[in-house]
Amino acid sequence: MTLPGGEISKRELHFIWIVDCSGSMRDDGKIQALNYAIKEAIPHMLRESENNIQANLLISALKFSTGAQWIIAPTRVNEFKWTDIEAKGETDLGQAFLLLSEILRIPPMTERGLPPVLVLLSDGQPTDNFKDGLEKLLSEPWGRKAIRVSIAIGEDANMDVLQRFIGDNERQPLLARNPESLTKYIKWVSTVVQTASARPKSQQKYYDGSISNVDIPKPPEIISGATDVW
């Protein structure tokens, strides 16, 4: 929509990190690699958002271990700063989904926003009832329509749970086997997926709003090798 004077009215685009900081993330430097990768992605997110005249990018972050909590409220990308998180406790993914569902309601979300981008990063198995939390998340309109991406940090991550979060058989969880691949995947989701959300398919004759109305490009191919540590 164009405002009087020719200025374009931007629509909110929420980008939300959902980060596993359970005790197993201490192993093999996983939590340090995650902190580094997100910090590295911030300048790329800023450049991408500056080229997108349609979206007002807001970044927030939710961590889960024993319980779940918001650690960063929705923040404009040019003001966003990542503070390193520590790993300890359980893997209460269901609690994270319940917290997430609360902010994806309308309100506080607006009806005319762009599809949110939800990025789940985890290295293990949920220790609570994640199914009820996921059901609640998907019962919210923006929970269903969100672009949901999951990144497995190492071979021990529960790929079935991460696939259920995505909810689309045409896309699979991304498997990061080392710090380098984690950094590449986080950069990809921070830039390419952000841009895709800001350009949803204009019209679909039979689109019913039940899933995200967005085409997502393929992620980068990463070949396993001797540097794999997870």
Residue ranges and their predicted role:
Residues 1-16, 21-32, 105-112:
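Acidic, polar low-complexity linker/tail segments
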Residues 13, 23-56:
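…and closely analogous acidic/polar surface helices at protein-protein or active-site interfaces
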Residues 18-22, 34, 61, 100, ...:
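DG-centered beta-turn motif at the end of beta-strands
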Residues 135, 154, 179, 197, ...:
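Extended acidic, low-complexity intrinsically disordered regions
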Residues 155-204, 208:
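Von Willebrand factor A/integrin I-like adhesion domains
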